[in-house]
């Protein structure tokens, strides 16, 4: 995602990788101990980028919200965040990572045994309907397979 106006004109991960190699960009990413940071490290590996060689190009957040804030405040040229966080913050998503780049982000759901098992199953069933999928898509999620 990029800040309002996209000052660096970043339009793709390919372009971002080239800017990182040249040292001509400031990118916000999550720390390596949080999921968004772990996905980012996979993207770096996909592009053959060495994080330790890019220290002047990177800022870190303790979580995806901190990375999103850095982008929203235009403290950085771009940030690697989830599309849903970009949507919530009103940021422009210029490219999306593919499953080949970093694997697929999956949010599992299950029904546990307990006194509200029927209600939980009904809710899980609803989450798999076309109506629910359209709500998910409207806020940046991809449909479940």
For the regions a language model picked out, list residue spans one by one.
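Exported/periplasmic ABC-transporter solute-binding proteins
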Residues: 2-145
